[in-house]
Amino acid sequence: MKFVLIGAGQRGMIYAKYARERGHEIAAVAEPDGIRRQIAAEAFGIPEGACFHTGKELLEQPKLGDAAIIATMDRDHFQEAVPALEKGYHLLLEKPISPVPEETLAIEETALRTGRHVSVCHVLRYSPFFRELKKAAAGGKVGRVITIQHNENIGNFHIAHSFVRGNWRRSDLASPLIMQKSCHDMDLLVWLAGSGCESVASFGDLTYFREENAPAGSARRCCDCPLKDSCRFSAYRCYLPVAGDWPAAVLTEDQSEEGLREAIRTGPYGRCVYRCDNNVCDHQVSILRFDNGVTATFNLSGFTDRMTRTIKIMGEDGEIRASEAENEIEIIRFASTGREAGEREVIRPEVAQSGHSGGDSGIVEDFLAMLEGRLGTSATDIRESVESHMMACAAEEARLTGTVVRIADFRRRHERKQQA
């Protein structure tokens, strides 16, 4: 099977490498960054004539493969996904589908009309950890699920890197925080609740990473700052110790100390975190009600030490406590009194070696199985994934307007806009 790769950044290269390892050909690449384009061409043996600057250029060619991996920036997905589907490509599409509801719905409509498969990279559904959690929730061990408490702990260093200095710092250039970081989590909540979402309320803001919170005497860039040796957000302290690994690997292809220092001196990751042009939230709390009566709270926060997810699922007969970082799922059956301990079971799922706890390789395997006829429908088929995107968009609308948003009404409103 032949793939074309549109977007040879970190995510696109991961998916393409898994496809290649399973014996499939990466036949063409589109990537505006010349160095990344060259790296992809060398890694996959792509001839110069099949290397393109943009997805538009690649998609103007005669069909070059069976499927396209689209892993460009959020706001580029629509202009690449629709022509790719019309051209006859199946899609492995990085999330989010699009930050614009009408574009998300248009991609879904095009996929259904053309009969092409679209798998959205909600990779967490494929990790052993979340598969075990789903099995525990759906298996009746705590009875019927009543309510869910879900925390996405972004990690303080991670929010500074990706959502203050980085590519996803502005909702107008990429997506709101809840879409970019947490359409994953909206998808998990639908999956764990076993139902579509009825309504959502949401609250949050950009509270801390603002100029008024900058330390006295600090500078606009770390290279000029007298506090660069002591500030926890100093780019020198954030990136030099992890040269060659994420997140330093995002700054530049040259991971030598000299290369990183130059990137810090001249690039966006060397800016003071209090003086960037970021506008996405640094924390957001959402309250959700599902069609089957399950309720959930979702806390998305950059003010955490660890970068992990913690979940509590509360049922009629017990509760499930899960920590992604600890790789532990604890199931507790309620006792008759507070003096006795309830029946307790601890599950430690298989530890996968690939990214996102095995989800990165899992979604590629799932996509390949679907294209090869070994699987009927992907767990993250476009029709499944649109639900989580409507939830994330509705949550952002609820946050901005201070209202409770009904998901069905929200979707109908944007369907009318998309069809207009």
What kind of feature is each model-predicted range?
Residues 124-271, 402:
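Predominantly a Rossmann-like dinucleotide-binding segment in NAD(P)-dependent oxidoreductases
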Residues 9, 49-110:
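Beta-loop-alpha module in the N-terminal Rossmann-like domain of NAD(P)-dependent dehydrogenases
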Residues 106-123, 143-148:
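Rossmann-fold dehydrogenase core element
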Residues 44, 280-420:
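C-terminal helical cap and adjacent loop that interface with cofactors, partners, or active-site loops
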Residues 39-48, 106-114:
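Short, conserved SAM-binding/catalytic segment
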Residues 1-46:
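N-terminal Rossmann-like dinucleotide-binding module
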Residues 28, 66-67, 147:
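Short, Asp-centered acidic motifs that coordinate Mg2+ and/or phosphate
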